[in-house]
């Protein structure tokens, strides 16, 4: 709503009468329009609220007010209201005249739409009837057409079936023609096409066609295979295959200059032709597979020419190592294992030089030597799978078998390059029953060896005691033998095919370490009364050595891989906390951490016991030194030469003897920990029990400093460059007690007047005091008796 002043304000005096009148008329018209709009809105609002008299009263009050002069505006207001009323009436008339027209137009449109809809419905009904009539008329035609289409499709299937048969027969006829003309290479190539056709037909549901196809392939495959195998065996016989003799004598019969090139050329031809039969051979021949419990890796069949080359060796193997032959003895697995290794070695040169080039020439990725080894390996695996159940519960026979198999595996991989991804004897040993038996036997024999090594007379003597450079760790024989045992166990299981099996062996090793630690603890307890004795020190050296070696092993790649495998197992089973899993994953911990922590705790306990023992004896030897008359000793100027206090001799001698004894019996790292622990206790003891318990004159302070700096500290100069840094309490106490009087007085004044820590610390540092607190220095100053008579 516009203010009343704006609506009824009189116009400004015009500069020009004409222009002023025009402006006045325009302003009046605009004011009237605004007033009409606003007034109508106000009136509607007022009437809506049901309070029209109040609205009129308020409007008059606002426009006229109490000013009598403003009554002149009434004519103008009446005129404005009249104009507004007329405009509103015109709007009402306009609206009332337009609405019926719109309604009539809408009704007309609706009527037209209804007519169109009715027309469409009539057309739809007519069309629906026509379509139904057409469908009824066309249905017999559709039925006839469907029958014809079905017949055509059936005929097409018959034609396709006949085409397949024709194609098979054509290939079969071609093979027959090639064989009649002795064209074996083309016959072999055609058989390859037939085998590929067989593979394409595998998805068909035509069982008779598939049977016919397979029977045809089988028929020609047998004929070609028999012929080529016979020819190939004949040519191999001319080469004196197989080579039973050692490699150096294999050239006999092969170096005939006239026939050798022809033989090898024919060998290559037959080899390639046999290789072509590989596809059909794989279709027809089910490869021999050991039971699934052995979890052998999937592998293709040995290529056909190598199979033929392996046949005489397979016959020999089965002849000698099956049945009741004298060579088939459960207690002698090394016989057939050594025989297989010998065969591989005897034929390696021929396979690499004569057969591999043929495979390379035809673009095959097969390695002849490894393929040959794989074929022989299957004989070994079958033999092991047969023999192991027979000797599973005879510890000696089973252990011997495992030893021989591990030696065989080592030579097979290291000498002959047999890949770890191929099927191997370790897969047989990993079978659940066999593996658990292996673990049991391994544990049993390991415990027996531990018993024997600990009961040996030389158990606690180092093998290298007379060789200084080698004997730094001073390792007793039992500890070194035990770690060698663990190392051998690692070598035995590191080639197992699965991480889970390796982790089970790792747990066995950890159990053995814990068992050995317990045995060492038992022996140690028997030697507790002689904690400085040779055997006690040997046990301590053993504990330290085992802990050190395990820490080194933790960084070995093999054990890091096992740690990662263990992490995955623990994560799957939720057997560790998130913190422990995080430590394993970040390599902050290792698989041996639990064992190392237990060994370190045992080492610390044993060292503490030794330190306590020596410290007790040192305290006993220091009784006279504690009672020294420090108050009445002559000053340094009164003595010609300073000498060691006689009462300190027992203390220093006891200390020296024990240090020499333990230096000889403990390894360097242990002895370093020992003397540092001892020095820490000795420093506090002398400071508290001797220095703080006495008063010192000038001579007493000088004598104490001489005894400490010239006699006690040098005892440890063999083990470190600055031994005084390990006796900080004694060293700084001697500094305070031996300050000249002026410096001591000045320091005392500074300490007494120091308001803050900084000034006192600076003063203490200036005289070389870093360890002792301000209160300790004040106590030491009060222990001095050589103060001047100044009241201080």
UniProtKB/Swiss-Prot annotation:
Write down the InterPro entries for this protein, in alphabetical order. Answer: EXOC6PINT-1/Sec15/Tip20_C_dom2 (IPR042044), RINT1_Tip20 (IPR007528)
Question: Could you tell me which residues belong to the region Disordered?
Answer: 1-22
All disulfide bonds of the chain are none
A cellular component term from Gene Ontology for this protein is: endoplasmic reticulum
Q: Where does the RINT1/TIP20 domain lie?
A: 220-792
Q: Where does the source fall among the domains of life?
A: Eukaryota
From the record, what ranges are coiled-coil?
103-124
Provide the GO biological process annotations.
endoplasmic reticulum to Golgi vesicle-mediated transport; mitotic G2 DNA damage checkpoint signaling; protein transport; regulation of ER to Golgi vesicle-mediated transport; retrograde vesicle-mediated transport, Golgi to endoplasmic reticulum
Compartmental location: Cytoplasm; Endoplasmic reticulum membrane
Q: Which Pfam families does the record match to this protein?
A: RINT1_TIP1
Q: What is the stated purpose of this protein? A: Involved in regulation of membrane traffic between the Golgi and the endoplasmic reticulum (ER); the function is proposed to depend on its association in the NRZ complex which is believed to play a role in SNARE assembly at the ER. May play a role in cell cycle checkpoint control. Essential for telomere length control.
The illness linked here is: Infantile liver failure syndrome 3: A form of infantile liver failure syndrome, a life-threatening disorder of hepatic function that manifests with acute liver failure in the first months or years of life. ILFS3 is an autosomal recessive form characterized by recurrent episodes of acute liver failure often triggered by infection or fever. Affected individuals also have skeletal anomalies of the vertebral bodies and femoral heads.
Tell me the protein family, please: Belongs to the RINT1 family.
Q: What is this protein called?
A: RAD50-interacting protein 1
């Amino acid at each position: 709503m516009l203010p009343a002043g704006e609506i009824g304000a009189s116009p400004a005096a015009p500069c020009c009468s004409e222009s002023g009148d025009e402006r006045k008329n325009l302003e009046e018209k605009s004011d009237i329009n605004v007033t009409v709009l606003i007034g109508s809105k106000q009136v509607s609002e007022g009437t809506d609220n049901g309070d029209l008299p109040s609205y009129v009263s308020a409007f008059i009050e606002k426009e006229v007010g109490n000013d009598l002069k403003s009554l002149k505006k009434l004519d103008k207001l009446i005129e404005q209201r009249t104009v507004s009323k007329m405009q509103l009436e015109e709007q009402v008339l306009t609206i009332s005249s337009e609405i019926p027209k719109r309604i009539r137009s809408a009704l007309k449109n609706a009527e037209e739409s209804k007519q169109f809809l009715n027309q469409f419905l009539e057309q739809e009904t007519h069309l629906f009837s026509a379509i139904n009539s057409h469908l009824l008329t066309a249905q017999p035609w559709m039925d006839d057409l469907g029958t014809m289409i079905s017949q055509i499709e059936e005929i097409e299937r018959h034609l396709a079936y006949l085409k397949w048969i024709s194609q098979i027969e054509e290939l079969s006829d071609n093979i027959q023609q090639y064989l009649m003309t002795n064209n074996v290479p083309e016959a072999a190539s055609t058989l390859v096409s037939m085998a590929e056709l067989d593979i394409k037909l595998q998805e068909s549901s035509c069982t008779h066609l598939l049977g016919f196809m397979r029977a045809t392939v089988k028929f020609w495959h047998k004929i070609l295979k028999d012929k080529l195998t016979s020819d190939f065996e004949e040519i191999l016989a001319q080469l004196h295959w197989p080579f039973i003799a050692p490699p150096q004598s294999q050239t006999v019969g092969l170096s005939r200059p006239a026939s050798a090139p022809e033989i090898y050329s024919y060998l290559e031809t037959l080899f390639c032709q046999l290789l072509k039969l590989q596809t059909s051979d794989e279709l027809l021949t089910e490869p021999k597979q050991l039971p699934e419990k052995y979890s052998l890796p999937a592998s293709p069949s040995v290529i056909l020419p190598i199979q033929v080359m392996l046949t005489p060796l397979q016959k020999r193997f089965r002849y000698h190592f099956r049945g009741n032959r004298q060579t088939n003895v459960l207690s002698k697995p090394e016989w057939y294992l050594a025989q297989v290794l010998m065969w591989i070695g005897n034929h390696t040169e021929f396979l690499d030089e004569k057969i591999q080039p043929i495979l390379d020439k035809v673009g095959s990725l097969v390695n002849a030597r490894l393929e040959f080894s794989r074929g022989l390996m299957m004989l070994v695996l079958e033999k092991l799978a047969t023999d192991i159940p027979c000797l599973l519960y005879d510890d000696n026979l089973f252990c011997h078998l495992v030893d021989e198999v591990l030696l065989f595996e080592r030579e097979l991989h290291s000498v002959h390059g047999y890949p770890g991804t191929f099927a191997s004897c370790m897969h047989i040993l990993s079978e659940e029953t066999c593996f658990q038996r292996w673990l049991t036997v391994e544990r049993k024999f390991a415990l027996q060896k531990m018993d024997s090594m600990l009961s040996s007379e030389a158990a606690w003597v180092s093998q290298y005691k007379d060789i200084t450079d080698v004997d730094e760790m001073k390792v007793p024989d039992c500890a070194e033998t035990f770690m060698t045992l663990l190392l051998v166990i690692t070598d035995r299981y590191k080639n197992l095919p699965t991480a889970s099996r390796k982790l089970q062996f790792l747990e066995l090793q950890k159990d053995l370490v814990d068992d050995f630690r317990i045995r060492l603890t038992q022996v140690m307890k028997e030697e507790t009364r002689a904690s400085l004795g040779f055997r006690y020190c040997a046990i301590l050296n053993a504990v330290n050595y085992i802990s050190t070696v395990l820490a080194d092993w933790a960084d070995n790649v093999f054990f890091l891989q096992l740690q990662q495998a263990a992490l995955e197992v623990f994560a799957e089973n939720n057997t560790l906390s998130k913190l422990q899993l995080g430590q394993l994953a970040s390599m902050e911990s290792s698989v041996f951490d639990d064992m190392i922590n237990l060994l370190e705790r045992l080492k610390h306990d044993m060292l503490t016991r030794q330190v306590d023992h020596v410290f007790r004896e040192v305290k006993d030897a220091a009784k006279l030194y504690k009672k020294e008359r420090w108050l009445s000793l002559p000053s340094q100027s009164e003595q010609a030469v300073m000498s060691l206090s006689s009462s300190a001799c027992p203390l220093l001698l006891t200390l020296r003897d024990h240090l020499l004894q333990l230096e000889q019996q403990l390894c360097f790292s242990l002895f370093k920990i020992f003397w540092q622990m001892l020095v820490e206790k000795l420093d506090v003891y002398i400071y508290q029990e001797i220095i703080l318990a006495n008063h010192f004159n000038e001579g007493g302070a000088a004598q104490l400093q001489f005894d400490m700096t010239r006699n006690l500290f040098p005892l440890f100069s063999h083990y470190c460059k600055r031994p005084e840094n390990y006796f900080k309490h004694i060293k700084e106490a001697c500094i305070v007690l031996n300050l000249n009087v002026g410096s001591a007085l000045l320091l005392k004044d500074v300490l007494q007047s120091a308001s803050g820590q900084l000034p006192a610390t600076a003063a203490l540092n200036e005289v070389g005091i870093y360890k002792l607190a301000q209160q300790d220095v004040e106590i030491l100053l009060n222990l001095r008796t050589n103060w001047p008579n100044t009241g201080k």
